Amino acid sequence: MIFLKNICKNIGENAILKNVSLSIEKGEFVAIIGQSGSGKTSLLNIIGTLDTPSSGTYVFDEYEVTKLNNDEKARLRREKIGFIFQRYNLLSLLSAKENVSLPAVYAGKNLQERSQNAKKLLNDLELAHKLDSKPNELSGGQQQRVSIARALINGGELILADEPTGALDSKSGIMVLEILQKLNEQGHTIVLVTHDPKIAAQAKRVIEIKDGEILSDTKKEKAQEKLILKTMPKEKKTLTLLKNQAFECFKIAYSSILAHKLRSILTMLGIIIGIASVVCVVALGLGSQAKVLESIARLGTNTIEIRPGKGFGDLRSGKTRLNFSDLETLRSLEYLEAVDAHSNTSGVATYTNISLSARAEGVGVNNFAIEGLRIDAGRILNNDDVKNSTNVAVLDFNAKKNLFPDEKSENILGRVVLFNSQPFKIIGVLQKDTDKPIEDNVVRFYIPYTTLMNKLTGDRNLREIIVKVKDDVSSTLAENAIIRILEIKRGQKDFFTFNSDTFKQAITANKRTTTILTACVAVIALIVGGIGVMNIMLVSVSERTREIGIRMAIGARREDIMMQFLIEAVMICTIGAILGVILSIFVIFAFNTLSTDFPMILNAYSVLLGLLSSMFIGVVFGFFPARNAANLNPISALSKE
């Protein structure tokens, strides 16, 4: 079963084992005796595949151990070898039953099977009443019996006992030795390390070691048969094994987080702030963007303004005029929903003893809808008003406020106001325009454009034509078509257009840029939080080095250890993300309750993005601590206090 030839172990310049050669048959009970520092524990660790010899050949169950990789050695420990340690090496957060079941988790056995086997073993060892007890609730003898049960859960063909009675009273020590003798009688191979000759005498074979060399062996040597070596088959990953890995990792991660509540919360704080920032920034951006777009919509979506000249501020635009022929041409286009003229002039408005500067806006019937003007009282202009050049006016909020400061809108309907000495009957009052980005104090009278031309200015040309494009038509294509048609009609391009969608797109692009810049700050907060997670995980690996060594000793693969710490990092980040989302919901609710300017809009995609990004942060910043844990040497890890 075990064959060692010329095994040497060196640590620096010190030779711990010197050309040790021995063989152990299946079913033997062997005691290795020696004083402290003799090399007996180092030899046991090499036999148990926890340590690697500096030179020599080691064959276990026809596998050449010195040529196996770490995971293949872990498989041998998991399937063939059971350890009984002097200090028990039970995991403090797990119950007796859970400690016993742990090697079966890594072996891929289902929950029912490993639970039944653990109960049976503990019952056989007279611990049926201690199934749910934690190690600190057990005596030394009881803890060692739990350790024995753990060594047997996967079969334990080879039991390696390192000073199993060293920390026990005499009664408990005798009980442990009796258990080992019974196990040997049942066919288990036992290798016992001790410094006590009385304990060694309980074995059927005694090997004495001193200064790394075998002094004596009570077994008579026989001719060595030719060794038959075999290659270890590739381990198949079953669904049960994967479920066991995931469940165990989540359970340990959860227990670890609960065991260090304050530290975990402080670690999560960076993630909480980062995720809350991401969600709130997106909500703020969406809310302000929606408000701006709503304002643009009220001012007129899909609208195009046609003005004379080469552009805004063109000093020669006064020499160019739009006319009614242009207006009628545009009205004939089927892809335009509405077309109307717009002109204006400045003057003085008078009511009783109040006189003030004002502007008369000559508009058509459709201008109110196109520009998003909302009526507060009365009515807007109709076709008869425009056709007959009627002296009627719709006052804006500023006009009503300055001319009729203490009266309700409906009470001033029908009254007459003078504008440049022309009387105008008030037929309507507009609501306050809250959608303008900059509030102005201009007093406006909305009158028929025909009235303005015929009775105020005498100018038959138009200052502006406003069109509204149908919803199913691209405003850009419509704008290009209008330019082409008017250019052909007028013989030259002596006008320019302003498309409201261009403004809308500029606002959207600006908001997108602002959101990205603000989101970058949130991402930086996430990265800072991730660095905090990595720091704490490195501390956690350092604190739990002994636990890692125990898990490796009972057969945990490198990927099991790595997954355990990686899932813990991801769990910390995910819990932090969930708390961050909850915090952001409270912030959004409070903001929407207190603010009337615009709402914050919670976006499901930003929440999902926050959760996914937190998991990504957990994987990225948890990888290095997890890798460090997986690369630990089992012997170094077990010796860590």
UniProtKB/Swiss-Prot annotation:
GO terms for biological process: response to antibiotic. One of its GO terms (cellular component) is plasma membrane. It is found in: Cell inner membrane. It is an enzyme of class 7 (translocase). Residues 2-236 form the ABC transporter domain. GO terms for molecular function: ATP binding; ATP hydrolysis activity; transmembrane transporter activity. It is a multi-pass membrane protein. InterPro entries: AAA+_ATPase, ABC3_permease_C, ABC_transporter-like_ATP-bd, ABC_transporter-like_CS, MacB-like_ATP-bd, MacB_PCD, Macrolide_Exporter_MacB, P-loop_NTPase. Belongs to the ABC transporter superfamily. Macrolide exporter (TC 3.A.1.122) family. Non-canonical ABC transporter that contains transmembrane domains (TMD), which form a pore in the inner membrane, and an ATP-binding domain (NBD), which is responsible for energy generation. Confers resistance against macrolides. This is Macrolide export ATP-binding/permease protein MacB. It comes from Campylobacter jejuni subsp. jejuni serotype O:2 (strain ATCC 700819 / NCTC 11168). The lineage of its organism: Bacteria, Pseudomonadati, Campylobacterota, Epsilonproteobacteria, Campylobacterales.
